Amino acid sequence: MKNNFDENKTPVVAIWETTQACDVPSLEYDRVQPEADPLELNTLEALQLIDEVGELSPPIFVLTGADPLKREDIYELVQHASERGLHPFLALPATPLLTPAAIAELKHAGLSRLILNLDAANPELHDLVCGIHGSFDRTMEAIQWADHWKLPYQITTHFCERNLHELENLAALLQTFRIKQWNVAFPVPTTLDELEKTPSAGEFESAFVRLYTLAQRVSFKIKTSEAPHYRRYVLQQQAKERGGLQPQGHQVQEGIPGILPFNESRGTLFISHTGDVYPCSALHVMAGNVRVASVAEIYRSSQVFTLLRDPANLTGKCGLCAFKGVCGGSRARAYVLHGDMFTQDPSCIYRPTEQAAVRNSVPRTLPSEKVAIEEP
């Protein structure tokens, strides 16, 4: 991705929740219902939405939902997105609807990448974490089907207290696959019960150490969701390896293109099944609805997006931090836990006042694609 990409005009990632319908309850998707919401976007509205996203032309367009295969028009929608030049990704749970025939039809429709979930290298632990019995085995089968049809795929892991120890085991298992990318999704608690089960800031930091080490060893890209402060850790480690930070704006590694940092405060948008638009799926502050205004108008002009894109609005230690230009903290986590989407991210252990000397030395770009950045 080019460093001059203007995230004020075009999101890096656009995500559309196609449906909340799913035949199988899941611990990782709390909005599941057996049948489609009567208010979800119909086929004509969905096609119009894809046209509008196509005009924005984000590098990444992800179709997600409880189970997108519950939509009878999903193959038509994937094909339309492909024809619009959007290179669609599709996230699918391991339900009975995930079959060899479904994989084949998605490939034929022009799907660019399949996203599958794997929360542990151990079948029993994976099924326990995701809440779908037998999902580990079906995911393994889906990987084989994707390989057969030469459909690129990536794996998402939901990091939680139950699988804290599994990162190395998962990386070893994923090395045996032909995956393009491993995305480690960090939790945003929405209830007190979830908060008690959420890894601590120290455990986040420990995971960063391990992910950075693994990124040097594996053949696929490792990226993160809801952990923008992993970029801060990466920059700190690479500064140590170089013996000091380079001047602001300098490439972090010579000869490797910088990657634009993005999160819900900059460069992403999420569209719900009913057309409501949010900065991301975890930040429930609505910016508009596609039935009322265009996606471009909402993303470029709504108060929610324009305020979040300005790092000067950050408060607490995130506002003081030298790394706010490449991080910005999780605005969703700040909002859920503090009721303020501009305050500090409680999952970060970094204390910016201790590093005031580097405040003007942090680059805006990131290094190798082998190193994690934010992505769905």
Language-model features, listed with the residues they occupy:
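N-terminal [4Fe-4S]-dependent radical SAM core
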Residues: 1-17, 55, 254, 374-376
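C-terminal accessory region of radical SAM enzymes
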Residues: 203-251, 276-329, 333
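Iron-sulfur (Fe-S) cluster-binding segments and ferredoxin-like electron-carrier domains
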Residues: 31-40, 284-291, 324-360
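Radical SAM/AdoMet-radical enzyme domain recognition
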Residues: 27, 35, 40-64, 71-203
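Short, acidic, Ser/Thr-enriched surface-loop or helix-capping motifs
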Residues: 176, 271-272
